[in-house]
Amino acid sequence: YNGVWASCPAINWNHFLLGGFWPEVVMQEKKHFLSSSKNRFFIEQVHERYGGETEFYHSTQKPTFDADTCIGMRSPGGVITQADADVMNEIWRGPHRRDGRPLWYGYYPGIKNWQVVIPIGTYYYPTPFSKKIKPFILGPLYARWITEEPKQTFEDLTWDEYVELFDQGSAKFGDNLADDPCIDDFVQAGGKLMMDHGMDDPLIPTDGTIDYYRKLVQHFGGKAAVDKFCRLYINPGDNHGNCWGNGPGITQSAGMKALVDWVEHGIAPTKLYKVRIHPKTGAILEEGQAVPFEEPEIL
């Protein structure tokens, strides 16, 4: 292809799929279960700190929040304890080794990357009263490729076992992680790459796509060189690139037109039309303009 538009790309395959085990590993390690009601309460507190849902989902800044500030508050699931806050902070921090070195990125505080009953998201609670969570189905499927044990369940993974699984997957499938910035042949052939990612994506961490963009900048010697063939758009509030999340996303027509214009007519994309629609009626709820990513936007 002369042009590629990767929307909420499933790159860094090993890392983000195994990231679905992390919340369960945290609860297992700390011997404390965080209920869905308390989990939701933490999300609501993040939104409140940023001025409410609307303000939160339209901020271009990476949100930060310390769950310890909620200790002692009353939630629908009971009083928030130190143990609750410890689990929440560790989940937000993302997978890492015992010495603190990161394995991969977590999800931003305030982002709901889990569900109750519905097995969609990074992880889910099988029932509203569950005392255990489960990862997104692709996580265990991929992990079985790593261990070559088709019936392995990976329940009650310890932290050390999780890190070992993570390292084993990286070593075994290192050539298939879709994270290589050395796309020189594509670039030299005149190829153009557009990427976008919603900050409210519940399946793939937004920072993983930003990480790949930074690898491109490093590999090709700076942003000016990358600008000749690549554009990255980070859309606050947009879900998994579907335009019906909590903020507007780039439409298929706008994205494809921009890519075609760039590849066939040499017109580099700048601002792109984005929209938020009602998931059932299709009615337009919000419109806006997506702008190319700049480092000061999200640090």
Predicted segment positions?
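C-terminal His-loop and adjacent cap/lid subdomain of alpha/beta-hydrolase
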Residues: 1-299
